């Protein structure tokens, strides 16, 4: 235990919090260009073909982003918006693609949770 005199000379240092999404650089979203669109398999015990893409961001970072929802129109050179948020069963995937923004279309025929998938309110 430090004495009061030691603490006066050199106060206790604060722990520096590490960001979970370093490529965003404290921004809510970032724009980038798809360099590769592919599917990958999750870790045990799950089984699927998850849609992901490699993205070269405007700040020079190259990250992997998950494409949520059923079906997408992304291909190489598509310009997309990414946000933070990891995918628990895909190692190394720490970002999500924002559906319905820039070149990424919203999910077709989506009726519920539409705001998360970039879908306008259907005509009644």
Curated annotation (Swiss-Prot):
The keyword Cytoplasm does not apply. One of its GO terms (molecular function) is structural constituent of ribosome. The keyword Transferase does not apply. Transmembrane segments: none annotated. Keywords: Ribonucleoprotein, Ribosomal protein, RNA-binding, rRNA-binding, tRNA-binding. It holds the Pfam family Ribosom_S12_S23. GO terms for cellular component: ribosome; small ribosomal subunit. Signal peptide: none annotated. GO terms for biological process: translation. With S4 and S5 plays an important role in translational accuracy. PANTHER family: 30S RIBOSOMAL PROTEIN S12 FAMILY MEMBER (PTHR11652). This is Small ribosomal subunit protein uS12. It comes from Yersinia pestis.
């Amino acid at each position: 235990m430090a004495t009061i005199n030691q603490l006066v000379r050199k106060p206790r240092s604060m722990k520096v919090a590490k960001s979970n999404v370093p490529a965003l650089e404290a921004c809510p979203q970032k724009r980038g260009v798809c360099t590769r669109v592919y599917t990958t398999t999750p870790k045990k015990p799950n089984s699927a073909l998850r849609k992901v893409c490699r993205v070269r961001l405007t700040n020079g970072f190259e990250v992997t982003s998950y494409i949520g929802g059923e079906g997408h129109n992304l291909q190489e050179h598509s310009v997309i918006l990414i946000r933070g948020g990891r995918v628990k069963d895909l190692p190394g995937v720490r970002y999500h693609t924002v559906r319905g923004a820039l070149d990424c279309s919203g999910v077709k025929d989506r009726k519920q949770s539409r705001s998360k998938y970039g879908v306008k309110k259907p005509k009644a």
